[in-house]
Amino acid sequence: MTRHLLIAGVAVAALSLAACGQQTETKGAATPAEQAATPDANPAATVITPSNEAAAPDFVAKAAASDMFEVEAAKLAQTKAKNPGVKKFADEMVTAHTKSTADLKKAIADSGQTLALPTALPKDLQDKLSDLGKAENFDKAYMDNQVDAHQAALDVLQRYAQDGDVPVIKAFAAATAPVVQQHLDMARKIRDAVK
C-alpha cells in the first residue's frame, strides 16, 4: 500500500513538474523579445495568447508604448540617418505611428473604457532608444531595431485581434495589423539594402 502511494506521489510530482515546464515554455514563447529573435517564424500562428494580453489595459499599454517608441526612434533617425531610404522610412513612421496612436485613443473612447495611455516609455524601450542613439552604424542599427519592433508590435496586434476582450479595441487591432505588416516588410527590405 505504501509503495502504491509512493508511486502515485512520484507520478503526480512528475506531471506537475512537466506542466510547470510547459507553462514556462508557452509564456516564454509569447514574449515579443523572443519572437523577434526568430524573425522568419510565424509566432501568431503558433503562440497561445497569454491571458493578460487578451485584456484591454495590457494591450493598450503595449500598443501605445510601441507607437511612442516608433515615433521617438524615427525622430532620432530623421537627424542621425545617412541613407535617404532610412530617412524616408523614419518620416513615414512618425506619420503612421502618430495616426495609430490617435486611432487607438478613438477606439478607447468609442469603447466606453476608461483606459489611460502611458506618458513615458517603459524602461526596456527607453534603454533600446538610448542604445540606438549610441550606435556606430546608426542606419543599420535603426533598421535592425525596426524589424524587431514591428514584428513584436504585429504579434501583439494579431493576438489581441484574435482574442481581445473589447470589440471596438479588437477591431482597431485587426485594422492596424496589416499596416504594421507593411511597415515590417518595408523595414526588412531597407535593412537588407543598408550596409
Name what the model sees in each region.
Residues T2-V10, A14-K195:
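His/Met- and acidic-residue-enriched segments that coordinate or traffic transition-metal cofactors
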